[in-house]
């Protein structure tokens, strides 16, 4: 779905583990990495699109994750002119995204990028929380920075709680 300004309505997905790391996926047949994302179909809510994309791209279902947060606003980025398909109607000049922060609630062995019709990714790894902001393709960087900044206080407690628990145990041994 493309809005009146030429932006494709889309969802972005940040999956966090209990160590405060995020899921980082390698685009199929390429050397570029990104978060899972995908378009919102006609009649679909952003949350429905997120769960559909999560399954198609990562193989996870609603019961495998917990929604921690949704971005307050739509975040937009423009495509570089070389990537705009000028011959398609309507012309899409960029993405307008609603972002979701999810916590993985299942074992990571459930991740399966072969469930969709054509795989979007052919590799993945856990990376530190801020790593994607520095590593994503430049035209998406500001949107990533804004989404990650908005989610930081909600994602970081997973890591901090685990670390604090270890410190308390170590202090008791003392």
From Swiss-Prot:
Ranges for domain Nudix hydrolase: 6-149
GO molecular function, one term: mRNA 5'-diphosphatase activity
Keywords for the protein's UniProt record, in alphabetical order: Hydrolase
EC number(s) recorded for this UniProt protein: 3.6.1.-
Residue ranges annotated as motif Nudix box: 38-59
EC class (word): hydrolase
Needed co-factor(s): a divalent metal cation
Record keyword Hydrolase present: yes
Segments crossing the lipid bilayer: none
Keyword Metal-binding among UniProt keywords: no
Xref: InterPro entries: Nudix_hydrolase, NUDIX_hydrolase-like_dom_sf, NUDIX_hydrolase_CS, NUDIX_hydrolase_dom, RppH
Family matches, as Pfam families: NUDIX
Function: Accelerates the degradation of transcripts by removing pyrophosphate from the 5'-end of triphosphorylated RNA, leading to a more labile monophosphorylated state that can stimulate subsequent ribonuclease cleavage.
Protein name: RNA pyrophosphohydrolase
Organism: Vibrio parahaemolyticus serotype O3:K6 (strain RIMD 2210633)
